[in-house]
Amino acid sequence: MNTQAILVLDFGSQYSQLIARRIREIGVYTKVIPYYTPLKEIKNMNISGIILSGSPASVYSKEAPTLNMEIFNLKIPILGICYGMQIIVKLFGGLVSKDSKQEYGSSEIFLRDEKSLLFSELPNKFQIIMSHGDSIEKIPDNFKQLAFTKNCIASISNETQKIYGLQFHPEVTHSEFGDQIIKNFVFKICQAQINWSLEGNLETIVKKIKLKVGSKKVILGLSGGTDSLVCALLIKKAINENLICVFVNTGLLRKNEDKKILELKHQYDLNIKYIDASTKFLNRLKNISDPEEKRKIIGKEFVDVFEKITLEDQNIEYLAQGTIYSDVIESKSKDSSSSKIKSHHNVGGLPDKMSLKLLEPLNEFFKDEIIQIGINLGIKKESLYRHPFPGPGLAIRIIGEVTQEKINILQEADNILTEELFINDLYYQIRQAFVVLLPVKSVGVMGDQRTYEYTAVIRCVNTQDFMTAEWTELPYSFLKKVSSRIINEVRGINRVCYDISSKPPSTIEWE
């Protein structure tokens, strides 16, 4: 594919793919590649602009990712974001001060040069999101300061060479006018053309699946979630009956999940094979408390189940997964400069060696794009807007060791939360809601009897893309009702808490 693109050089930021998403939203094709990609390869690409991403690293670290200076001689507009700006300053002879003026969260920015194309059509002050430990102390020669906060230089430019820097993150939804800044860079500075659409990409994906798979068969673990269902219908569109959907009952599912999954067979004419492996999964998780170990065990068990199926049908060659962009980002290892948050069983929990080839047709799309694809595929609202459920299931919502008793307790508590959300017309107003069971017991009193039982935590968030999220401010009356029902109806819980943590710094799931 030689479509002209905006190129994002990834220095390991968790937001690198989010930058790409923002640009694709305005109709411009975007590619994300590692910062260490050889300059020769970059020269051979058809690109109209380059963005240097942020990074968890410090420019002063011995292992800090750096950049070939020759990239600035390509006469292509360049925008550095956060670490990207700091590396520009360092390479051009400016001064970056280590840990001098850290800023995290919301800050007010003031424009010094309102004539710059980067800040065209913007007010002279607005709120932005900062996330940096190092700061610019001295800008390089031939650069000028475009904007500042009370604590740091917020933006610089070399207008002649079309090199720009931002200390803040315009790609994050909570940065005011971030979309406009990105548009200004893409259209006014890079002169990029609109050349990307979701519909066009869908046609391309279907063709790629047909070409890659050929006459071979594909198996897909169907979880009932949006991602796996969209993935299934997309692959079915490409290879029809050669898709075999496998529903593995791990015993770690939501209440009555097996019935809901099997209903999909008739709704969407899917070939679904049901396998009850609940005893095996639970036995393998015995005495395991570490969340990473739980994820990897579950990932391996899934593959074992699928590989046994392939022994029955030698024409099965591919294992399909509904892996999406945010899964990939959060599972990046430190080897690629990105701080690892957690491994997803979709990408980080699979064994290195397996006989099946991997097929991940959705791994370049964000959650809201997946939903749009689902709409185009005719998926019903109750399936399409169902709250996400992790591949490892309740194993990562039970903190610590997983037991059958804890699974039963959590299934009932989580079901009560879901019921009340529907009763109060709140379910579709929240992007994700679930209950976490803590390995913490506390004293309570019920009917003049002393109790010593588990603590449950309600987690509800709103988000556009699952890269950042805000906790949902639910009515106290609703929380009171849910808490009362859980404590009175679920044996084993005598205390309910509400999680009011946003992402970042917290992740949505607890493990």
UniProtKB/Swiss-Prot annotation:
Which cysteine residues pair off into disulfide bonds?
none
The enzyme's E.C. designation: 6.3.5.2
Q: Where does ATP bind?
A: S223, G224, G225, T226, D227, S228, L229
Where is each Glutamine amidotransferase type-1 domain found? 5-195
Q: What does this protein do?
A: Catalyzes the synthesis of GMP from XMP.
Q: Extract one GO cellular component term from the record.
A: cytosol
Put simply, this protein is called GMP synthase [glutamine-hydrolyzing]
The record's catalysed reaction(s) read: XMP + L-glutamine + ATP + H2O = GMP + L-glutamate + AMP + diphosphate + 2 H(+)
- Do you know which PROSITE patterns this protein is assigned to? GATASE_TYPE_1, GMPS_ATP_PPASE
Q: Which residues form a coiled coil?
A: none
Q: Where is the GMPS ATP-PPase domain?
A: 196-386
Q: Cite the active-site annotation.
A: C82, H169, E171
Name the HAMAP family for this protein: GMP_synthase
